Structures are given as C-alpha cells and as structure tokens.
C-alpha cells in the first residue's frame, strides 16, 4: 500500500523545543503547503539517524555531532535546517556530590550519557586532564540523566541547560534546596571548542527522499519557518496551543523548560557554516569522522535570505550565559539581541 504521508521522527518523546513542528501541524501550516506529516516519537533516541538514513522514516531531528557521524557510518542523512542553536551542553551534577569545576573530580564517579557519542566525548576529555576512560564508570541513561542523578543511580550526566539542568533545578526547589546547587561542567569549555554547536538540534532528512521530493522539503521548511515566526512573536499563545494539543506540556516544569529554550530557537533555520566547520573538526578529533570528511548539510531548501553570521561567537556565548541566568531568575520570554 502506498501513501503520500511524510514521516517525521522526533529525537525523543515530545518536548518543549519540539513546538515548531507541532505548531506547523496544529495551525494548519503543513496543510496550507499540501503536506500530510506524521509526527512520530522514537522508543530509543539513538535509533533516529538509522531509521531516517535507512529510509524507513523520511525526516527527523538530531544533534549536529550525531548527524555528522551518521553519514560517516553510511547512513545517508543531511541537515536541511536548524531548530535549536547551540544550547549549553555539559556534565550536570549537584553541589555536594564531590564534583567540582575541576574535571579531575570526576575520577571514580558514575557519569551518565544519552548515547554512545556522549561517552566518546567524555573519553576524549580524559586524555586532556591526565586521566583515562577507566577512571570513571560510564552509565547509559537515554534521556533520564536528571532522574538518575536525583535517584542516586549516577553522580552526574550529560545534559543540556534548557532541559536536564532545569529538571535538576526544579527538583531542588521542591526539596526546599537552592536551585543554584544544580551545576554544569560545560563540554565546550572543557574541550576548548569555542561553541556549543555540536549539540545544535537539526532538521534532517534521508538523502533519497530529498532528491526525489525537493519541493516537499521546501514546503516543509516553509511551514516550519511560519510556525517558528509565530512562536517567537507570540510565545504565550503558542505555548498554550501546544499544551492544548499535548496536555503533557501543561506543567510548570515544561513551561520553565520552554522559557529557557526560547532564546536558543533558530529564527532563520539556517545551518551556520562556521559551526559546521568547528564540529566537523571536533568529529575528527573524536575519531568519529575521517580526515577528508565533508559536512552533510545544505541551506538549499530555505527560500528566504540567509542572515549574517555572528562576528564574535565566543562573546555571543558569554552574553547568552548571562541571558539564561536572567531567564532562570525572572522567567518570561526574551531573545538575546546582539548589537
């Protein structure tokens, strides 16, 4: 049986930052483009690139480092746009766990990670801090890093500031503790990368699907851009509409996550060339990409002007850190505006 339905696989169960995809469906933007999109949730986040690459699913979401590694491993996927730009990513832990800002404090600790590349990143970092991978215990957690930290199953784990870090902060508040006791050792700082772009969340698609359906890809991105524009202009209304469609979003915790995600959303959806160069080099350093590897991304299907890249990305990251601290304290919806 054949179908004109296009399948789109999220990188995990519905989360606050998936809002543009759901809004494009809720508000009829896909329908306006004559698209019928089936939004799917994986049972295992590590399956996404394999399912999209094998053609079992047409499109999906995945982080930049995973997208690069997937193509290098023979799964024909390409990034066609950006969803969440450079969310701060690192090793989350709690004050009093024996972990400090010194990476060597991780010796003997149980470190949780989502998928194999998280372990590869930590293993590579040990080389730079006088340690080996045998100096810590790796625990695969999927998306349950914060839960496992709170339960005591692990001492720390890899997460992003606007999701797992928020989960830890809010759990501490419920316990009557200081939310500032939720800490993060940022991987970009530890690895001296100059950006958190390796964890940028991307819209990806199967290469054969792109080649055979270029207009559908353009229309999909046009609908996503329209949804993104609406969300950025009307965050409260957009969040309410998402919550009506996905009642699991209607919690204080998820609202706080959305507020913290808000500044990271890519307004243009463009793949940032400089970020791809950095992560391509980082992938080679991690030995997951060959030396002659060419990054697998395209902006060909974005039909609006490409914005100018940020002049000083490291300064922008410093400003974003201050911005997110303010959001943590005050809440609300505010974008970082660079002069």
From Swiss-Prot:
EC numbers on record: 2.-.-.-
Enzyme class: transferase
Reactions catalysed: N(6)-(pyridoxal phosphate)-L-lysyl-[4-amino-5-hydroxymethyl-2-methylpyrimidine phosphate synthase] + L-histidyl-[4-amino-5-hydroxymethyl-2-methylpyrimidine phosphate synthase] + 2 Fe(3+) + 4 H2O = L-lysyl-[4-amino-5-hydroxymethyl-2-methylpyrimidine phosphate synthase] + (2S)-2-amino-5-hydroxy-4-oxopentanoyl-[4-amino-5-hydroxymethyl-2-methylpyrimidine phosphate synthase] + 4-amino-2-methyl-5-(phosphooxymethyl)pyrimidine + 3-oxopropanoate + 2 Fe(2+) + 2 H(+)
Key words of the record: Iron, Metal-binding, Pyridoxal phosphate, Thiamine biosynthesis, Transferase
Residues annotated as the enzyme's active site: 66
A GO biological-process term: thiamine biosynthetic process
Subunit note: Homodimer.
Family to which this protein belongs: Belongs to the NMT1/THI5 family.
UniProt protein name: 4-amino-5-hydroxymethyl-2-methylpyrimidine phosphate synthase
Species of provenance: Candida albicans (strain WO-1) (Yeast)
